[in-house]
Structures are given as structure tokens and as C-alpha cells.
Amino acid sequence: MTRLDEYDYNYVLILSGDQLYQMDLAAFMQQHLEKESELTIATIPVVAEDATGFGIMKVNQENEIEKFTEKPSADVLSDWTSDVPERYAAEKKHFLASMGIYLFKKETLKQLFALNPSEVDFGKGIIPFAINKFYKVHSYAYEGYWEDIGTIRSFFEANLELAMPLPRFNLYDAHNPVFTRSRMLSPSKLLGTSCTHVLIGDGCIINAQEITQSVIGIRSRIGKGSVVRRVVMMGMDMYENYDDVLSQKIIPMGI
């Protein structure tokens, strides 16, 4: 909070760094303001198999969170089912899970930290404390695409899905465009390569025999005759800084 005190603001939005989703944060904020919440948690329904890995909650008809437990064991899950929209119920997603996305009033967050000076975990400490002490804590029901990519497997599969014809997270959706930072790289060059369901970044030179269901990162080089299937290639996306160049005692690029 010491760093946050250096700025003038009224609300604190905390986002998780290991998730893939597209959310209208303006709508998230709007609900927070309308309900005069002190804390709003973005939530999504999940199946029982996944519920043990998330913070699970129970809410009332006003979406106010009445109970919260972090990563419940399988033997108590029956006590944590919620009423969910029909399409989620049909998929057996009966458990309301925290997405790790929080919107706090500034003073609420400062107060919770002051009352819990040694607490460093929102799910295990801060949120249960806020609910038990009757702070106004609400759930924001998110219904779009969301994927936890906190494991190597989930990160890998989410990337491969991007190369499919109609992925759930669509990079080419005109209504939800995705922008990256601009780069001054040449177009990628393919030399006689057969490609099926592939995303290829800028600046690549590819002379493979075949690439199938793969994501090829920027400035990649793939040699003649290679067969690439179900691969996420991060690419040469690291640029050396000046200190790195000096430590190698080489002539800087461009001279």
C-alpha cells in the first residue's frame, strides 16, 4: 500500500496474470458502483473436478457473497453448489468460482490490510475476513471465455486452440479486437511449407516440410525438412539490453 499511496485514486482493480479472457471491465465497475460494493469479485461457474482448485462461494439473490472457502476438499463440495444459468447447469458447472479478479474501494483495501498486517493471500485471508466482518462483498457473474493458464499444460492447450478455425478466444473478432505492441519486423517467409491450423508471428523464415496445429513465435527459424506438429514455439522474443551487450564485450548491433 505504500506505493499506492503515492497516487490519487478511489478504486483498486487487481487482475490475475495467469489467465486468458476478454472482459468488459467497464461493466464490472458499473455493477460495483450500482451496488455500492466495498469489494467485488469476478466469478465463473466450474465443474466439481475444477472446484477444488479455486475459491468457491455462495451468494444471495442480490449477488452478495455470504460464504467463501478457498480450494475446498472434494468431500465437502456438496455444500457449495449454486444456482447457475441453464447452459452452465447442463455442463454440470454448479460451483461459483473466484477468477482472482478483484475490485476494491481504496479505503476498504487499506483497512483490510491494516487489520491483517501479516496476511499476504487474498483467497485464504483477506476475502474470508471481509465476508465474516460483514463488508459489502459482491459477485460479478462473468459469462465469456476464460481459461486458467497457470500450468504448462493449460498454457500449451490454450495457445494451440488459438490456431483452430473458430477458437473460443478469437483473435480476429471485429467486436473484440486484440492489439499487440508495434514491431518493425519483416513479414514472415515460408519456403514450400505445408501449413494446417497454424499461427505464425512476424520475422520468421520457415523451410519446414509440414507444420500442423502449432503456434510459431516471432523471429523463429525452422530448417528444411522439419515436421512440426502440436508445437508452441515461443520464438526469439528476447532483446538484449545495453548492459547485456557490454558484458559480452562485443560490438553493438548497427555499428
Which residues does each PLM region occupy?
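Left-handed beta-helix
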Residues: 86-87, 107, 111-255
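Unchanged
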Residues: 1-161, 252-253
